[in-house]
A protein has these predicted regions:
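Long, C-terminal-biased catalytic regions of enzyme "large/alpha" subunits
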Residues: 1-351
Length: 351
């Protein structure tokens, strides 16, 4: 696929989501492709055919990324709506949804967001610490200020945007590892309960930190202009964490299930076999932590479904991403979305 075709697919996807083509797809209704530049109708297509094309292209290439831009603008921070700001696009992974372009003061903005991710696998170690999330938000505020102070003139638009809104993105990793540590299956009501509990806690503490820092250091200019007491315009964003999850001891990435219970990690230093530590602990208890067993798991793409010495409950706990009903990922995403003021980078795993 050419770069032009990829670009066209991304534009179609954004227009498609903005005007809710998915509602019309079930009825084979006509769908207008509307230019975001001037609002003119460039073409009318069958909604179902467009949806099918998007799904097939995404399955084959991983693209286009789908962003609900109408929802993003409707749910942006209240003071940004009052200022008439608009989100036109996201970053590549689609978790950063900040205003760009000419703002209400006639200045051009380039979005800037400082990110950090909490390790949910270690939830029990930090959730009771009242200062923990506030300290992280202070750290992000300091990083943002350092960027504002030191950014070169060539980054004037980004520097201006960072100064005006001071947006940060607190995210997570290790959700599936936490569930496995607690012997909880991903496809379970208890996983749903933990998902809600964790994000309600993180969101509430991030909101508290924004107020505390606004009182201590002053609200960001965008908020101050409308009388809002917020240090950060945006506070949360669920970003992919493939690399930092490895740094954090191999915890599960982001909010997603693990792809395999054993895999080969290739680095510049060589190739290393990585095993799921919670599964290894279970196998050891059953006296099954052997090379033959692990090789059989590896041969089956990291799945334990074939191991007859595991109970159905144990197999459910160690299901891999492609074995899990993807509707659970969508349900969890919907449940946590009210607590996230930017967006979630969410992958679906379709075999």
């Amino acid at each position: 696929m050419s770069g032009a075709e990829q670009c066209a697919n991304f534009i179609e996807a954004e227009t498609f989501q903005t005007t809710r083509c998915d509602d019309r797809a079930a009825h084979h209704e006509g769908f207008d492709l509307v230019s975001p530049r001037d609002g003119s109708v460039r073409k009318t297509v069958d909604a179902r055919s467009l949806f099918q094309k998007l799904v097939e292209t995404r399955l084959a290439t991983g693209e286009p990324y789908i962003v609900f831009s109408d929802t993003v603008n409707r749910m942006m921070p209240k003071h940004h709506r009052e200022l008439g700001l608009k989100v036109s696009t996201s970053n590549l992974c689609a978790e950063i949804t900040l205003p760009t372009g000419i703002d209400h003061l006639g200045n051009d903005r380039t979005a800037v967001c400082c990110l950090s991710s909490l390790n949910l696998e270690k939830w029990d170690e930090w959730n009771g610490d009242k200062q923990f999330i506030e300290d992280i938000m202070r750290f992000l505020d300091n990083v943002l200020q350092d960027y504002i102070d030191r950014a070169p003139d060539q980054m004037a638009r980004a520097k201006y945007s960072a100064m005006r809104e001071r947006s940060v993105g607190l995210g997570v990793m290790g959700f599936h590892s936490f569930l496995q540590a607690k012997s909880i299956g991903f496809e379970s009501p208890m996983a749903k309960v933990w998902n809600l509990k964790m994000f309600k806690h993180i969101s509430a503490k991030a909101e508290e930190a924004s107020l505390v820092l606004a009182q201590e250091r002053g609200p960001c200019p965008d908020a101050a202009e409308t009388g809002a007491m917020e240090r950060f315009s945006c506070k949360m964003a669920i970003a992919p964490t493939a690399s930092i999850s490895i740094i954090c001891g191999g915890t599960s990435a982001c909010i997603e299930p693990i792809p395999a219970n054993i895999y080969t990690h290739k680095t510049l230093s060589g190739s290393f076999i990585v095993k799921n530590p919670y599964l290894q602990e279970l196998l050891a208890k059953k006296s099954k932590d052997s090379t033959n067993v692990w090789n059989s798991i590896l041969e089956r793409g990291g799945s334990v479904a074939h191991l007859d010495f595991l109970t159905p409950e144990e197999k459910a706990i160690y299901k891999t991403s492609f074995e899990i009903d993807q509707r659970w990922l969508l349900e969890f995403a919907a449940d946590r979305s009210p607590m996230i003021d930017q967006a979630q980078s969410l992958n679906l795993f379709i075999p």
